Amino acid sequence: MQQTESPILTVPATSTLSSPEVATSADLREDFLKALRCMILSRTLEEKLGSLYRAGGRIVGGVYLGRGQEAFSASAGINIRLGKDIYGPLIRDQAGRIAYGEPILDCVRTHLGAVTGPMRGRDGNIHRGRPQEGYMAMISHLGSLVSVVAGALFARRLRGTLGDCAGATSIGDGGTSTGAFHEGLNMAAVEKLPLVISVANNQFAYSTPTTRQYACEDLVDRARGYGAEGYSVDGTDLLACIATFKKAFARARAGHGPQMVVGRLLRLGGHGEHDDASYIPDTIKHQHEGRDCIEVAKKQALKLGWASETDLQTWEEEARREVDAAQAIASKEPAPDPYRETWRALSTHELIEGQHG
């Protein structure tokens, strides 16, 4: 399949939106502004986490950031209903987590190993969630979350509680080559489950370029092989991403089976903060996909008259205050006591000493 100038390419082709059509959709304004504020907060939070990691101290393990992927992630997150839908985010989905409704204090507590966090200090950083609420903790084995979220949807169907619930999970270009990804997507397609898969094609699976990962022209081609509906979108264009995910979630909820959204973008940093990404050529960094999606979104907001320079500055200041406040709280909270803890990371409903249910 050949790339087009349109920000959105649909397979099978049900509609194609051009940039002007997307930009003049006033009904996207509320979602756009919510997503943009989530992106700003996410970037501010991740800059703080990166700084704490480099300084050494309480953050144990790796720090994985979503710089460059915020627009794609947040656009999915604003469509996922907290406490109703099922969400299984991946390592670069901080913007999506915020848009979904996760308090940033949960993130900071987990990174600092506080016993008050959702993982109670037993599992760290990106491996956090509240499964009893439909918020799945990330699994390091890439592709596995596709089956987990699909299985959770199938379980609700069997129990008669599915209703208009949708499930969503994320994966990168490299993860789409795993067996778990294919098994999960195949099951979801056969059962016509309301699953939306966000594929962040950030050009590298750690240090392996896409030219060494797959031979199809666009990863969205893989959706067709399973009978799923697929969309290829400019992952740096917030307006296009919002319009695409809005449609994908609507079709999933309406019974059209799994939807796969592929975002074309670039990871603006290393695999983690330990990685200098020196293997990424400058020629790729300067391509269209290398644009900073937050700067693109700010320009869109100003051009459309949806926000002013003062608004943007205010949101950035508010984000800094919120992040600083979360750090101040979590920094004073204790780590788990190894002599008194059960080390059951996901027993989040049993924070009272002595309860082991």
Predicted feature residues:
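Conserved acidic/glycine
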Residues: 1-72, 269-357
